[in-house]
A protein has these predicted regions:
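N-terminal Rossmann NAD(P)H-binding glycine-rich loop of SDR-like oxidoreductase domains
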Residues: 3-23
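Amphipathic terminal alpha-helices
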Residues: 11, 23, 27, 305-330
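C-terminal "lid/loop" region of Rossmann-like NAD(P)-dependent oxidoreductases
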Residues: 31, 207-208, 212, 241-242, ...
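NAD(P)-dependent short-chain dehydrogenase/reductase
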Residues: 40, 129-135, 157-218, 222-233, ...
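Conserved C-terminal active-site "lid" loop/helix of NAD(P)H-dependent oxidoreductases
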Residues: 44, 222, 241, 275-300, ...
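NAD(P)H-binding glycine-rich loop region in Rossmannoid oxidoreductase-like domains
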Residues: 53-96
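Catalytic helix-loop patch of NAD(P)-dependent Rossmann-fold dehydrogenases
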Residues: 88-103, 110, 116, 124-172, ...
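Non-catalytic, hydrophobic alpha-helical segments
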Residues: 225, 229, 244, 255, ...
Length: 330
């Protein structure tokens, strides 16, 4: 049996590959990557998986990879996933996330394949939700507040349409905030952890730059997310959509306080709002209702968010030390 992970070099993709290799060794793991994709997230498993160069915006390259792999399951995780970047590059974000997803579905149709497909959308599709709609359910209206969110609405609806029009066995998720070691430095809790590690190493002044600390998020650990994605294709019927989220709900400021409690330099670090980190249109309240998914799969988050934060901080401490010669401020 073969699983194909698009975006395997990324944060969740690499963790998912590790989990499948460890817990489901009967599965053969294939992954797509761009030719320029960094591969450090795969350093411990690269010899145990098969990588394929592939550009989601190039239909012919997807047809080539799918024809070679003939996957039984596809975890479609590849995306331009940074909200702030989407404001700077909206066309590229739409091209990668919407057109890339449609190309994947078209390649499957062209080849007449019938894999189970996980199409990974985002809680960002819901945008700024009214207080009376918290916690957010799957039937909450879309109010996308960024080009990234618009692209994920497009991906989500493409998954819906390709299932109902063509019978592709697509199951959609709208994933809420998730974190852990290897999380990209542009994302809020990972950015904070990286800054703390740099301050501890003496290569950043003791000023921690932040955006909006009042926004509310519900955090999940990447290891719990990977379990959820596997259970999704094990237990859930094609055509359905599920919110998936953790249970650690707090403001960004409360999350920062938890992180600062993990460093001996807490009292020396100044927190400073950086206007460059503020979104043009913020989404301030993201609390999921994951009841539908939990009922279908029996899934529950297992990793405390304090451990998630500690994992991120230790990751950045190791990374900063290993790259200290290039990390120093000019």
């Amino acid at each position: 049996m073969r699983a194909l992970i698009t975006g395997i070099t990324g944060f969740v993709g690499s963790h998912l590959a590790e989990m499948i290799l460890r817990d489901h060794p009967e599965w053969e793991i294939h992954g797509t990557k761009r030719w320029r994709s960094p591969r450090q997230n795969l350093v411990d498993i690269e010899e145990s998986i098969t990588l394929h160069d592939c550009d989601l915006t190039d239909l012919s390259s997807l047809i080539r990879v799918l024809d070679e792999v003939k996957p039984d399951r596809i975890f479609h995780l590849a995306a331009q996933s940074y909200v702030m970047m989407s404001y700077r590059a909206p066309t590229a974000t739409i091209d990668t996330n919407v057109n890339g997803t449609i190309n994947l579905f078209e390649a499957i149709r062209t080849l007449g394949q019938d894999p189970l497909i996980h199409a990974c959308s985002s809680s960002e599709v819901y945008g700024q939700v009214r207080d009376e709609d918290i916690p957010i359910k799957e039937d909450t209206p879309f109010r996308p507040a960024s080009p990234y969110a618009v692209s994920k609405v497009g991906e989500d609806m493409a998954g819906y349409m390709y299932h109902h029009a063509y019978g592709l066995r697509i199951i959609r998720t709208r994933m809420f905030t998730h974190s852990g070691a290897r999380r990209g430095e542009v994302f809020v809790d990972s950015s904070f952890a990286r800054q703390v590690a740099r301050i501890e190493a003496g290569i950043q002044e003791p000023v921690l730059r932040v955006g909006n600390l009042d926004s509310v998020r519900t955090f999940a650990d990447v290891k719990d997310v990977c379990r959820a994605y596997w259970l999704l294709l094990e237990k859930c019927p094609p055509g359905e959509v599920y919110n998936i989220g953790g249970e650690a709900t707090m403001t960004i400021g409360e999350m920062l306080d938890m992180l600062l409690d993990m460093t001996d330099l807490k009292d020396q670090i100044q927190v400073k709002v950086d206007p460059a980190l503020l979104r043009p249109a913020d989404v301030t309240n993201q609390v999921p209702a994951s009841d539908k998914f939990k009922a279908a799969t029996g899934w529950r988050p297992a990793v405390p968010y304090s451990q998630t934060l500690r994992d991120m901080l230790e990751y950045w401490r190791s990374n900063v030390v290993a790259n200290s010669t290039t990390e120093r401020d000019q």
